[in-house]
Amino acid sequence: MDAILNAEPELRLAAFLSVLAIMALWEIAAPRRRRDIPRVIRWTNNLALVVIDTAILRLTFPILAVGLAVIAEDRGWGLFNTLEVPVWAAVLVSMLLLDIAIYLQHVMFHAIPALWRLHRMHHADLEFDATTGLRFHPIEILISMVFKLAVVAALGPPAVAVLLFEVILNATALFNHANISLPPSVDRWLRWIVVTPDMHRVHHSVDPRETNSNYGFNLPWWDRLLGTYIAQPAKGHTGMDIGIEQFRTTRDLWIDRMLVQPIRGPASGYALDMSGYSKPQSEQALDSQSDKTNIPDTEERD
């Protein structure tokens, strides 16, 4: 086990590159939506942002989540290091608690205007594919890591649980942002156990009522239990508009514009309280029927 934990950076990088390659090939072979912006523009800038984020993170924090979990185990910090529970139970419960913590963190970034200024860069992507799942402002990455380290210190989860969670979260973030086509029957059942691309795409709708839904990155249960789940976008997956209203030009997709986006324009328009919007009966019926049957869009799939 020590060897696996010591090889954490290499394992995470290998998993990341493997899943990214699979998603990229899948997007080319079976895209869900038509691509209007040249891939080279978005992918070059989104991937450059990953390099910047990773460098800043490594320079800022001497240890990350897995390393802190190892220290917590050695020093008896956190809840699970004070309880006598089987390792398998501690691993499973820790991964569940870490996942709901990430869900709540995501909600927080939508609820607080200053944090939304950072997070909206992720939403301002004008298309939705695997690299969208990598597009986060460096300051958001730093704040997220502080939050994650605090959760790890409080819980004291087994280090292997944190490693598994990080690898799975990275993989599912690439998967559920991918522009890939799944058979309707597969999506209908899969979204009960993992956030699917069709489920998460709703969250990237330009409509604030849909933006403030489907916060889960990994497990879909929290959205369903806490009332933030929307089954399908009102305009359908090939008809919906991706992004936010403030930043709609191709120039906004370049990294220099992305990095200064938090200080550009107001942070209004996507307040979390809009998630309490009461849908018309027609939309509620559509969501209910779509969730049961997952009828594909009437538009031809690209």
Where are these regions (language model features)?
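Short, strongly hydrophobic alpha-helical membrane anchors
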Residues: 1-10
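Cytosolic-facing loops and C-terminal tails of multi-pass membrane proteins
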Residues: 235-302
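Membrane-helix interface motif
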Residues: 63-73
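Structural signature of hydrophobic alpha-helical transmembrane segments
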Residues: 11-21
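Membrane-embedded catalytic scaffold of the fatty acid hydroxylase/desaturase
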Residues: 51-64, 79, 85-239
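Membrane-interface helix-loop junction between the first two transmembrane segments
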Residues: 25-44
